[in-house]
């Protein structure tokens, strides 16, 4: 155990234009305003947002990297139908990395690190009071990044940051219909508590429970959207089947 602080300083994040483009397109996709059967152009989107084409293209390229859209030469871009297996695949990778990172954080965290984690939780709680979902999940992202940084693996931290971004882009929020901000917040408390007491197995177990809960909810949401004709038992069976196929080895 060390007392050296390794959690990055906490600071509000300003969204780049490319990120704003990503969020705008994501919101339009999830609202049904952008559909897979329609072609769109960078020029039209640039005009709509009132910004130059360069940041629009940057944001769209990141969405293409995440599998949200695809560019076709001389046609523009279109929305890609989400694949439930993509969601399960992302979470299988997260499950292979994040519990181990939480366990390492419990070993390495010093008093200053734990204080920063508590501060991030306080920011999340304040966002709940305001019912500010966007800010809540920004602090949530920072908390997960802080935990990954305590794991002393820069490569894992970078991979996880990319996967969490892909998760937010590929799926809609689970909060609106399936769980509250308070429930999401409560899943983080045992993770930080275990790190504060340097209980590595408990930290890993709490992180596994949190990531699994989120992954299964997002998978169910994705399947429900693709197959509205399925009843609840059929949906649960399909979720179990896909989840088991992707995570049984972990």
Regions found by a protein language model. Give the residues of each.
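Short helix-capping/hinge motifs at transmembrane helix termini and TM-loop junctions
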Residues: 106-107, 152, 176-177
């Amino acid at each position: 155990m060390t007392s050296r602080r390794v959690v990055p300083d906490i600071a509000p994040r300003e969204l780049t234009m490319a990120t704003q483009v990503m969020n705008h397109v994501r919101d339009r996709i999830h609202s049904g305003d952008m559909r897979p059967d329609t072609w769109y152009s960078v020029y039209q989107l640039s005009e709509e947002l009132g910004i130059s084409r360069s940041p629009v293209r940057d944001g769209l390229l990141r969405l293409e990297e995440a599998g949200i859209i695809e560019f076709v030469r001389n046609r523009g871009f279109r929305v890609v139908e989400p694949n439930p297996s993509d969601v399960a695949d992302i979470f299988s990778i997260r499950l292979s990395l994040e519990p181990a990172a939480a366990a390492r954080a419990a070993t390495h965290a010093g008093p200053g690190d734990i204080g920063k984690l508590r501060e991030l939780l306080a920011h999340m709680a304040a966002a709940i009071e305001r019912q500010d979902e966007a800010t809540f999940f920004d602090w949530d992202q920072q908390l997960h990044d802080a935990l990954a940084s305590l794991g002393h693996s820069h490569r894992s931290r970078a991979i996880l940051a990319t996967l969490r971004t892909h998760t937010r882009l590929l799926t809609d929020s689970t909060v609106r219909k399936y769980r509250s901000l308070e429930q999401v917040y409560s899943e983080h408390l045992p993770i930080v508590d275990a790190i504060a007491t340097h209980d590595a197995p408990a930290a890993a177990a709490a992180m596994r429970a949190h990531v699994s809960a989120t992954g299964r909810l997002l998978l169910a949401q994705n399947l429900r959207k693709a197959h509205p004709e399925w009843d609840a038992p059929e949906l649960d069976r399909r979720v179990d089947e896909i989840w088991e196929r992707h995570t049984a080895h972990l």
